[in-house]
Amino acid sequence: MNIDVASLLHQNDILLLFVVLAVGLSFGKIRFAKMQVGNSIGVLLTAILFGNAGFTFNTEALNIGFMLFIFCVGIEAGPNFFGIFFRDGKHYLLLALVVLLSAIAITLAMTHYLGLDIGLATGLMAGSLTATPVLVGAKDALNSGLSGISDPDIIKQTIDSLSVGYAMSYLMGLISLIFLAKLMPKLQKQDLAESSQQIARERGIGEVGQRKVYLPIIRAYRVGPELINWIDSRNLRELGIYRQTGCYIERIRRNGILANPDGDAILQEGDEIALVGYPDSHARLDPSFRNGKEVFDRDLLDLRIVEEEIVVKNDNISGKRLSELNLSEYGCFLNRVVRAQIEMPMDHNILLNKGDILQVSGEKSRVLGLAERIGFISIHSQIADLLAFCCFFIIGLLIGSITLAFGHVAFGLGSAAGLLIAGITLGFLRANHPTFGYVPQGALNMAKDLGLMVFMVGIGLSAGSNLFDSFAHIGPMVLVTSLMVSVIPVVLAYLFGAYVLKMNRALLFGAIIGARTCAPAMDMINEHARSTIPALGYAGTYAIANVLLTIAGTLIIIMN
């Protein structure tokens, strides 16, 4: 039996879609030196090759891809967006604006100088900035009629040009950004590793790699004469056992009665005490605790140690420094801090935002008490609130369909901006109401990644049919322009952040990468800095940059 694979793919669009996805994702796993091709590039290049071979797809049917992607981006940005925008994000907002406005200026200037059509120029800008939201906003402006173009053939030609420009410039944008991240600190005689260590020393930050990856343990000891001499009539607060060792006393048994001590309690000879702490903390205890006096008793040791993810929600906590939580008073241990899916360094001076996730371990009742003070414990359910997801998706589409008329000029946000606003709102409400709009992070990641990959298939198939012909005519101009759009905004943002805002170089580079929304480059920066300190800057600009880039893509098309 002979199977004509090409004919089968031409006849079955769904089969073609998933074949391109499977081949592209496999290609994305290939590594060159230390750099992985990545899913986006793998799928895009594969789709271009299939498009060049004559395979086509109704790209309108793939619009659900960019809609899912931009809606999920909004949900992720929602918990931190308003905190960054209104409180501590002045530097990050300015850096994002420097990158975006300079990129727009260069794009428009080169469009005029080289005579490029606006579709090609906008796609070139999106690819050069490795910013898919720009492409999403631009394509939506064309499809929704916001561009003012009514001729379907011109709209299709412009969308094809978008795809060609993006496909030509994406790889150049990614490689040049990574190259800049390595080269610029050396040219400025700045070592990212040293800059990271400087922040760590100034703020007392513990690196993520040094955090505990196991739960605290419980051990019990009997108070003997040696320990009484060491205590010297001091109460537990004055002894400061937690400050010295990292252990705290959870229970005391005195005369057969179990009690939870407070800071005023004074230990007496014969008391049996249960201490909670990491193994290395127990090892730091004074020998008077341990030498032959350990107690093995079920009632004394019957404590439930848990690890929970606490979401910051309460207004009286948002805006405070991590050190102000005084976790030691609650007998809890902080394992990590996560913001916008980025694991942050253990910086006790970091300002907490609503939606931040604190992974905390300790005795169950203490962790629950801390969660009540800070916010709420993240739901462990794997079931998504699909009703809220669908309702806010509908709201986003409705917002995008609203147009305002000023005489003969009509203006609207478009589906991309509408879905982004709805997603941000859902994410913000989720951070404030634990049972509303819950979407497991794994499900959110899958929806976002699948949406992006489906969108990339549409872009690649659309561009592939005439990409190589276009490259033969305008390829060198596009590559030069792409390099300018990629490099110049980064250099300007670096100079602005370093000499005007006086930012630490590690934080500055993280913020610039966040303004470019380029996760692969962020991994390279962390590796180059031998630290996760740059993630502090990345999280600061990432959320707001996604919003600005989407709006920018729409505005560029409308203005032309």
UniProtKB/Swiss-Prot annotation:
It comes from Photobacterium profundum (strain SS9). GO terms for biological process: potassium ion transport. Its main location: membrane. The chain crosses the membrane at residues 5-25, 37-57, 66-86, 91-111, 161-181, 386-406, 409-429, 452-472, 477-497, 506-526, 539-559. Residues 203-292, 293-377 form the RCK C-terminal domain. Belongs to the AAE transporter (TC 2.A.81) family. YbjL subfamily. Keywords: Cell membrane, Membrane, Repeat, Transmembrane, Transmembrane helix, Transport. It comes from the Bacteria. It is found in: Cell membrane. This is Putative transport protein PBPRA2420. GO terms for cellular component: plasma membrane. PROSITE patterns: RCK_C (PS51202). PANTHER family: K(+)_H(+) ANTIPORTER SUBUNIT KHTT (PTHR30445), TRANSPORT PROTEIN YBJL-RELATED (PTHR30445:SF10). GO terms for molecular function: monoatomic cation transmembrane transporter activity. It is a multi-pass membrane protein. The keyword Transmembrane helix applies.
